[in-house]
Amino acid sequence: MAKLLTTDIPLGCACGKLSGLALGVSASSGARVVCYCDDCQSYAAFLARPGITDAWGGTDVVQIAPSRVRLTNGVQGLACVRLSTKGMYRWHCAECKTPVANTLSYRVPFASLFRTFVDPGATDNACEELLGPPIGHVQTKFARGTLPNEPEPMLRVVMHCGRLLGKWWLTGAGSPSPFFDTATHAPAVEPRILTPVERASLRPEAKSQS
């Protein structure tokens, strides 16, 4: 059986102050997904940086085990926001507002790296060779307009990601994580929690009416 080739992929923000590596990555080591949920669109609106979402409001993310992620430069520039007290931890570069990753907690072993942070100098074709194409689209009910292609059934995508999550949990691949302290399990940076008013102003329906 041929050995699956893996590679270390550079990570970096637009201003170059925050960078690192995704270790031992292949098309089967994670799951590339496009998410159209209103929370991801709200986060993109909060960052106010072009190119985070596609024309339909989708965010291209790569779900991998946190232990594969190394932030080697500019870690002091890492910032975090939560859309609510129970929301995901959403990480970005404080300087240029490039989104880095979404995580749930120390105990849930996944990190959704933003495509804009993964090998930012690579072309889309080169990225697909390394990571594979998106395996599907989720939360398409929040998409802006009609998607050009019929999306994969969401259940199939969720089941695939669930299998990966179970594997990472069983193998302890959630630690070490650059986003949470190994000893205390606290987030690496104190998150800013948006107020209900701030969050409401960022919702897709609010932005479309402004």
Label each PLM-derived region with a short phrase:
Residues 1-12, 18-210:
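A short Gly-Trp-Pro
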